[in-house]
């Protein structure tokens, strides 16, 4: 009898995907529309994600161009960006909003690299929690022969190691992107 690790694989993969979503929101020195994913605009009385009220393009390496679908939302878009924690100053010409992405200081890059490490650690903790849950399930299964239990524990550990390694690679890639000028 083999122990089914499908649920564990899905949950560990979910931790990696959550990490990638979080890291996409951390801005680098280049313009990336993903940094605006968390910005919500008050549009007709409801908080609406920015990408649902405007198109976002990257005409140059350090410029984001935000074109509202409805010109009446322009002021709300500017306000939403100003109150966000992005630290960017939007410039509006009445039709579009330009966002110049400033060059990051070395200090800010290191600060963001620490944030990347913290997010990676959260993902690793999540993976380890899945491992702990599976190990507990294996120990609770009294019908499972000892050899099968040992094999299932080894498979779980191997799966955990693979996911931790993948998380480290994702974080290292983002850190490299941040620290490269």
Curated annotation (Swiss-Prot):
Chain segments carrying region Disordered: 135-160
Pfam families, per the entry: RRF
Primary subcellular site in the record, as a coarse category: cytoplasm
SUPFAM superfamilies: Ribosome recycling factor, RRF
GO biological process, one term: translational termination
Annotated signal sequence range: none
Keyword tRNA processing tagged: no
GO cellular component term of the entry, any: cytoplasm
Entry keyword annotation includes Cytoplasm: yes
Example of a GO MF term: ribosomal large subunit binding
Record key words, sorted: Cytoplasm, Protein biosynthesis
Location of the protein in the cell: Cytoplasm
InterPro entries: Ribosome_recyc_fac, Ribosome_recyc_fac_dom, RRF_sf
Function recorded in the entry: Responsible for the release of ribosomes from messenger RNA at the termination of protein biosynthesis. May increase the efficiency of translation by recycling ribosomes from one round of translation to another.
Family, similarity comment: Belongs to the RRF family.
UniProt xrefs under NCBIfam families: frr
Protein name according to UniProt: Ribosome-recycling factor
């Amino acid at each position: 009898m083999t122990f089914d690790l499908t649920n564990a694989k899905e949950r560990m993969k979910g931790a990696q995907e959550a990490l990638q979503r979080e890291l996409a929101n951390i801005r680098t020195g280049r313009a990336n529309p993903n940094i605006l994913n968390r910005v919500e605009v008050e549009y007709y009385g409801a908080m609406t994600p920015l990408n649902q009220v405007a198109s976002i393009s990257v005409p140059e390496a350090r410029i984001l161009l935000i074109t509202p679908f409805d010109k009446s939302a322009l002021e709300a878009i500017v306000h939403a960006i100003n109150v966000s924690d992005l630290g960017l100053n939007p410039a509006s010409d009445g039709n579009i909003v330009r966002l110049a992405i400033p060059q990051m200081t070395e200090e800010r890059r290191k600060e963001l690299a620490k944030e990347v490490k913290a997010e990676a650690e959260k993902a690793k903790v999540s993976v380890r929690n899945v491992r702990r849950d599976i190990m507990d399930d294996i120990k609770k299964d009294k019908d499972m022969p000892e050899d099968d239990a040992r094999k299932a524990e080894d498979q779980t550990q191997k799966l955990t190691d693979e996911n931790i390694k993948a998380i480290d690679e994702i974080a290292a890639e983002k850190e490299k992107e941040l620290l490269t000028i």
